[in-house]
Swiss-Prot record:
PROSITE patterns: KAZAL_1 (PS00282), KAZAL_2 (PS51465)
Protein name (database record): Serine protease inhibitor Kazal-type 6
Lineage, broadest ranks: Eukaryota, Metazoa, Chordata, Craniata, Vertebrata
Matches recorded under Pfam families: Kazal_1
Signal sequence, start to end: 1-23
SMART domains associated with the record: KAZAL (SM00280)
Keywords: Disulfide bond, Protease inhibitor, Pyrrolidone carboxylic acid, Secreted, Serine protease inhibitor, Signal
Originating gene: SPINK6
UniProt domain Kazal-like: residue ranges: 24-80
Organism: Homo sapiens (Human)
Amino acid sequence: MKLSGMFLLLSLALFCFLTGVFSQGGQVDCGEFQDPKVYCTRESNPHCGSDGQTYGNKCAFCKAIVKSGGKISLKHPGKC
């Protein structure tokens, strides 16, 4: 019984880890950057877009999404 419980616990931990790893791409909450009056800072926090472009930070990435009409998504955090 202890062995099956340990196996179940390890399986659950592995599932949670892999779910986090594979869900990195895709969605970013850009709500705070929808206003065209909001200007982006020069803070460096790269985002790799599905278009192969590296954006300097979340704000620049979100502005590109708006400009593209939602055609760009997050490929992964960091440089492309």
